[in-house]
Structures are given as C-alpha cells and as structure tokens.
Amino acid sequence: VRRSCSSNRVDPKDYSGFLKDYSRLQEAKSPSGDPVMRWIDPKVNINQYSQVFVEPSQFYPKPQPTTVISQQTLQEITRYFNEALRREIGSVMPLAKGPGPGVIVVRPAITAVSTSNEGLKPYEVIPIALISAGVNTAMGGRDQDVDVGVEAAFLDGSSQKVLAQVLFRTYFAHMLCVMFPTP
C-alpha cells in the first residue's frame, strides 16, 4: 500500500459523532504538511508521558455484517488497521501493555475510507471500499492509494482525561506526531 494523504479539509458535515466535542478542533498541519483538525489541551505536558497504549480500533458508526460483508471480514479489516496503527505509533513512542501512569491512551475510530482519486467517501460506502482495499491489502493484494478517515481521542492513562482529539484523512501514519509534534 502506498501512503497517500488527502489534501482536502475535513468538512464538518463529515464528522461522525465519535468525538465528544468537535467545537474545540482547529485546523493544523501534520509534520508532512497534510491538513488535520485537532485540539490539544493547553495544560498538557507531553514530557510526563513515556509510553502509549492503543485501544482496539472500531468502525464508527458500527456497520452491520451482511451477506456480502461478513463479521469475519469486518474483524480482518480492524485487525489490519490495528496492526498498522500500532506499528506507526510505536515508531514514535514505546507501546504500553495497558493504561496507567505516564501512558497516553489512543482511542481510534475508522470513520471513512476511499480507494479512488475522488476524495473521501462518507461512511455509507465504507464496506465496498474496505472489501476492495482493506482486505486485499491485508492479504498482500494490489498496490493502491488508500485514504482513511480517522477520529481519535488521546487520554491520560490514569485519569482518562481527554488530552487531545484529532480528525484527519490519511494513511494512518504518524498519528502521534500529528497530535504532539516536536518543536
């Protein structure tokens, strides 16, 4: 899979409802220059965190299995996404085995997927795109651009206080850098 980042700003009409408060999100640029919407608690001291725990991702809203898209297929897609997300975040900060002191908890949701040049599609079309992209890619299939809509909350591993929120369209690379870039 080639990494691809959409150049389109995330439109408020595409917000999934996964994050509790979208009003604090502000436009920003990722280290690679891609647009993101994010909020970081101005009081957060990133230096007090030494590890990150990535919760299992979820589709939001949750799709229902069909005769075309089985529960097993949906599980394969999230398994692949989880592995890729842990690999990418683990390249930035050590992974923790669970929440706790000094740990940032990442709570991610897959909210949209696109495998074409037309831009990100709303959630309704995810199953078709995921069948062709997520599963084929997970099984070593064709090489193509895959844009993913991601919403994530970053929580304190002890208090569960929201430290940051992010909403972006990308191939889930450098998620932690998007949230907490180094100066």
List each language-model region with its residue ranges.
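Flexible, active-site-adjacent loop/turn segments at secondary-structure boundaries
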Residues: 17-20, 35-37, 44, 111, ...
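Bacterial Sec signal peptide processing site at the extreme N-terminus
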Residues: 1-23
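A short acidic/small-residue loop/turn micro-motif
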Residues: 170-172
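N-terminal segment of the mature soluble domain
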Residues: 43-109
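Post-signal-peptide N-terminal segment of Sec-exported extracytoplasmic proteins
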Residues: 26-52
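A short acidic/glycine-rich loop-to-helix N-cap element
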Residues: 175-183
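Surface-exposed short loop/turn segments
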Residues: 87, 91-161, 178-179
